[in-house]
Amino acid sequence: KEGLIPLLDKIRAAGRPDLSALEGTYDIDAQKKVQNLLLSYIGFDFDAGGTAESAHPFTATLCRGDIRVTNHYHETHPISSIFSAIHEGGHAIFEQNIDSSLADTAAETVNLMGLHESQSRFYENILGRRPAFWIPIYGKLGGLLPQFKEVPFDTFCRAINDVHPSYIRTEADEVTYCLHIILRYEMEKAIFR
């Protein structure tokens, strides 16, 4: 916390990038196609799972070989569904890659939150926010969301790494996300003293 707050202040003082090129209305069905493109790109096996829409993104393991990824879509904010798809895809890939030799053992249901979140956040933030991740598929993104054809690649990369505090943890950037966790911990600690 002591290091994050001064860093956040420094970033805020530098100003936000111009994100006006991303403004507009984005077709929900097109966003669903983007989700499927991204899930396929990161290795989600559609023969062992599927997708659905929900109010809050989540991944559910119905049984071995049936992992469901859900997402939410905002007509004016496609970046949200893009990163929810990558994040939930990370959860799903983790589940899809539990070795079949572990079937019907306690190890098969290794649903430890730390393991799951490490995988999903690795896909979302370590891979998904790097320009190198997008180079092979950015043109396809523009094919599905025509507005992106007008968005220079560098502008897109700045947009997906923009630091902007949010009241919603799952919509927070990589700097302020940690502050959500710290604040929750401090509140819980104070409640149970």
Describe the predicted segments one by one.
Residues 1-78:
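Contiguous, non-catalytic segments that form substrate-binding/exosite surfaces or channel walls
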Residues 7-21, 99-106, 127-138, 193:
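Inter-helical turn/loop segments and adjacent helix faces that build the functional surface
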Residues 9, 59-68, 92-100, 153-162:
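Active-site-adjacent bridging/hinge elements
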Residues 27, 61-65, 74-82, 111-116, ...:
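Secondary-structure capping and boundary motifs in well-ordered enzyme cores
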Residues 70-75, 99-112:
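Short helix/strand-bridging catalytic loops that position acidic/His residues to coordinate divalent metals
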Residues 80-99, 117-121, 187:
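Active-site recognition of the HExxH zinc-binding catalytic motif
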Residues 109-148:
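Post-HExxH zinc-binding segment in Zn-dependent metallohydrolases
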Residues 132-193:
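Long, amphipathic alpha-helical stalk/connector segments used for oligomerization, subunit docking
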